[in-house]
Amino acid sequence: MVEKNNLPTLIRIFSYSILAITFVFLINNVLTVWFDWPGIKKLFSQFGLFGFRRLSTPLEGLSVALAFIQLLFYFISILLVYFYVRKSIEQTLETDAEILTKIAGYIIRSSFWAVLILGIVDFIISFMVVEKLFNEAIKFKLVNPSFRITFIHFPLVLISFIIGYFTRSVGFIWLAVLVVGSEFAIVLSRFIFNYEQAFQGDLVRFWYAALYLFASAYALMHEGHVRVDVLYTGFSEKRRAWTNSIGSLVLGIPLCLIIIFLGMGGKASIINGPALSFEITQQGSNGLYLLYLMAIYLAVFAVSMLIQFTSYFMSSSHKILNN
């Protein structure tokens, strides 16, 4: 029988374990997809475990060791969670929820700055390439997706995460204004100046997708998601806490995990595939080189929502136990 005094500790271990396992999965995904580590699926297939078919070409030597290391990461993450919870035994669920909310907020802020800066910079580059404002040597490098993404996009993403650390506000209102302004600029250039290029429409789609996916976790942080308001508004604080707790645990968290695990299930999956191949616009060098990032949007959406749903679950559990 679990004593009531132990429930907060168990909830903390359970909640942090979900996030820790997901974090390890993301690390293993990078190791498997980008660095050709075997992954734990092949390890299970090696021994025919959990219904996996045995490999036609068994793993050998270093590959087996790397696969076991990837499996070991999961056990280490659970142990770290346990020791962290035991070390901070006096910390309340509400405090944990606030910490997770800050982490989710940082991810969202940084992602906002990334799409803003990358959109503007890549728009300028595409415009100058189309209008032949670069010499042939520079143009040859800039139309190469690997060069453009590695030496321009990645550093800008890093700068965006630095900016996100020092800022505290999220400019989704400004991003919405920029989407409208970009669409308005397309109308003006098309019907007044008879000028239209693929990168103009790409920019609108790039920002528009970010606006909805990134703002989702932000709205959840500020109670902005719609429930059955006719019922919810009449609930007591305890019933609201039960609703939020069960909803997060049964609907929110599983949805995010499904997106992450299926979207990164292999090299050709919906998130890994475009990111691995540096997929760009279908318009060639006339468009923005940001299509691969729109696949990564799904991962950012799922991770930020997962963190915030876990925060929601912990804060709601705190209210239930206190009442």
List each model region and its residues.
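Alpha-helical transmembrane segments and membrane-interface helix-loop junctions
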Residues: 1-234, 238-323
